Amino acid sequence: LTSSYGMKLKGDFKALETSIELYRKALRMLIPIINDGWNLISERRYVNQKYNLIEKWIHNTHTNQALFDFDEQFPKFPTYLRRSAIAKALGIVSSYRSNLENWEREGKGQAPKLSLTHFTYPAYYKGNLFRNFDPVNQTIELKVFKNGDWIYEVYQLKTSDCNYYQTHLI
């Protein structure tokens, strides 16, 4: 069971907005890569195999030379955000491909279009993109892109949000 709860923040919103925009730009880059490689991706049976294939296409390691310049476009992009963007882009393309297949079979209406722009947000999971939640001081540290690097930045929280978190989400 997964639960989510939105909290009001006070702090450097510019850094947070920049981080979200970078995530969305990564998504815009990944969608056509995944769509163009759909035949190879769809041959993979398990979703983790699909994620691994896409990650090999975009991420350099000691044993892998990426086919696309994702790492150059998004230097120091956190692993969790990269994998989150891959999962989101795979879902977008999968939905588009399913809709396209249905349209081709039924031939009704206009053909679906694959949009590259999505106003989505990354999930900030504990340990990956947030840490040090302090209900007493009403603060939390979020990973944001600031001054050319991904750092943890302290944000203030509302008392009611801290109380709700302690009561319902711990």
Question: How should each PLM-predicted stretch be described?
Answer:
Residues 1-170:
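Nucleic-acid substrate recognition interfaces
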